[in-house]
Amino acid sequence: KNKMNDWLVAEHQKRFNAPPDFFTAGGFAAASAALTALTKAGSSDTEKLIAAMEGMDFDTPKGKMTFRKEDHQAMQSMYHFRIKKAQAGEWDLLELVREIPASELPVPVRNKR
């Protein structure tokens, strides 16, 4: 959980009377990345945005993400969940087993700049 996620869930529920889906969080993350890059670059110039985004950290509903400098891949922690046997409510489905930090994920760099 984080403040951005809490806000997104509350606003989505208020506006659409339903929780956000997976795609909503992804779109929100993309918008957060764009806003962070524009703020950091101080410009909409392509080369300045590229320089600003390489290695840039930005907040998302799923936690911090980082654009890897080597290939511009967005990296984030992954979450290992277990489905709960006993659920306290309609959306009380998962139990977090562990968080796997992005730094521990062996995603190869194939397309170097």
In which residue ranges do the predicted regions lie?
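Extracytosolic ligand-binding ectodomains
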Residues: 1-113
